[in-house]
A protein has these predicted regions:
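Extracytosolic ligand-binding ectodomains
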Residues: 2-22, 26-462
Length: 462
């Protein structure tokens, strides 16, 4: 059942369940609870994948370890790791495990762990930070800026289209996000909605990036944080460096409407499909809060008589639940969905719900390469960058910052985990002359990860 969450009073009471975590998402993964077993292993008996690199020689083990997963399973995995080892390996993790509470839950400061994550590196990052702080009394977390940008773009495109129609909204996505026109950001979103409703050209400049969409609906530029945990007594992570990257067409590319009909005195329908429960709950909840702020701003001002009906559904960090929740939003007639959080849910939801129902999907954190390759008729966008880029960033950090020459990977057994592991491995070996000894898959929700840790640390020879 779709829930109307348009009331500020309800939003204020929602609370924040951790602002620093997330999972790719973050890259891939709302697919957590329905990941499959490897071909030759069931339950916790995981085996290395056939796509892994050289197993290396002997039992000396790798210099570094890449772990790709989500916070809930990460707790047990890292407990097992620290109980089995002296913690001497350099460990690199992506955004999916960026949860400041993890060291306390694991019972170890995790000082040997470094992370990478898409950063809030947009031109209007500070304006968003202030809005989030004012609304919820806490600092924003990972992928919250991307969530705000997704919802804001959906509202602006709808205002420009003048109707709650997926195809009409799709045609306006690049027109309102890519150059040129009136520059709009979180700080003047209300004025931007009014301009879009009046048929004016606008250029949304986001909190997470410039939000220029390329021909695939991916961000044309992105920034990445290199970050560390602050220890067992903290609930935070610290970004120690931020690096910016641009694609071949930093101003964006792809089909776009030449003009927008606009329209006044109407209701914009917005769907929000993110995880309130399941493996990504701790990071999904702040993302939901961020996605609600654009609607709050518009409803308080009613520019050109525009109001926003924001409706939320919980993916439960599960592909089947995410598809069912998406169907609920489709039945409610939403033309645009901010979601989902992970590629494990985003891919099936897009294929089974958004694309056939001609609904625009714009994920704030689904980063798997498979999203780019969807046959989507241009209905699927995202404000988070592809793991094509994050895999390169991770390989560079592992080689140049952490100084590792031999590495094993441990990855959650879904599109996000497998594709990011393979992308990292390819770049690490081809561009940085490293050796990937083995790539080992693991399932979400296991009671022990000792066997997969042993396999990774022995280079797959155990």
């Amino acid at each position: 059942m779709v829930r109307d969450i348009d009331r500020r009073k309800f939003l204020k009471g929602a609370g924040i369940a951790g602002v620093a975590g997330l999972a790719g998402c973050i890259g891939g993964g709302d697919g957590g609870s329905e990941s499959t077993e490897t071909e030759s292993g069931g339950g916790s008996e995981m085996t290395e994948t056939e796509s892994g690199g050289s197993t290396g020689g002997g039992m000396s083990g790798p210099d570094g370890l890449v772990v790709i997963g989500y916070p809930e399973s990460g707790i047990q995995l890292f407990r097992d790791y620290y109980s089995q080892t002296d913690g001497s390996q350099s460990i690199l993790i992506p955004d999916g495990l960026r949860d400041g509470a993890l060291p306390a839950q694991v019972g170890n400061p995790m000082e040997n762990v470094t992370g990478t994550a898409p950063a809030a590196g947009g031109p209007n990052q500070e304006a968003f930070n202030e809005l989030f702080q004012e609304e919820y009394g806490s600092a924003p977390g990972v992928f919250t800026s991307q969530s705000f940008d997704s919802a804001a773009i959906g509202i602006l495109a709808n205002a420009a289209a003048g109707e709650n129609s997926g195809p009409a909204v799709k045609d306006q996505m690049r027109r309102i996000a890519n150059p040129g026109g009136m520059e709009v950001g979180p700080q003047n979103l209300v004025e931007g909605v009014e301009a879009a409703a009046n048929g004016e050209d606008i250029n949304y400049q986001g909190a997470s990036s410039a939000t220029n969409f390329d021909q695939n609906g991916d961000p044309a530029s992105a920034a990445y944080d290199i970050w560390e945990f602050e220890g067992v007594d903290s609930q935070s992570t610290t970004a120690v460096e931020t690096q910016s990257y641009s694609g071949e067409n930093p101003d964006g590319a792809g089909p776009s409407a030449d003009s927008g009909p606009g329209g006044s005195d109407r209701e914009v329908s917005l769907g929000i499909l993110l995880p309130e429960t399941g493996d990504l709950a701790s990071t999904g909840q702040p993302m939901i809060q961020a996605a609600q702020i654009p609607g709050i701003l518009v409803n308080e001002a009613n520019p050109a008589g525009i109001s926003v009906n924001a409706q939320i559904e919980d993916t439960q960090t599960s592909p089947s639940a995410g598809v069912a929740a998406g169907q609920s939003l489709a039945s409610a007639g939403v033309p645009f969905i901010c979601g989902t959080a992970s590629s494990g849910v985003n891919v099936p939801m897009s294929q089974q719900v958004a694309i056939p129902n001609e609904i625009v999907g714009c994920s704030p954190s689904s980063t798997a390469l498979s999203v780019t390759n969807l046959e989507d008729n241009d209905f699927i966008f995202r404000t988070a960058p592809s793991d094509q880029l994050q895999g390169r960033v991770m390989a560079q950090v592992m080689s140049e910052r952490l100084g590792a020459s031999t590495v094993s990977t441990l990855y959650v057994n879904n599109d996000y985990g497998q594709q990011l592991s393979e992308r990292f491995s390819s770049v690490f070996e081809d561009s940085f002359d490293g050796e990937v000894m083995t790539q080992v898959a693991f399932n979400i929700g296991e009671s022990s990860y000792s066997s997969v840790i042993e396999s990774a640390l022995s280079g797959g020879s155990s």
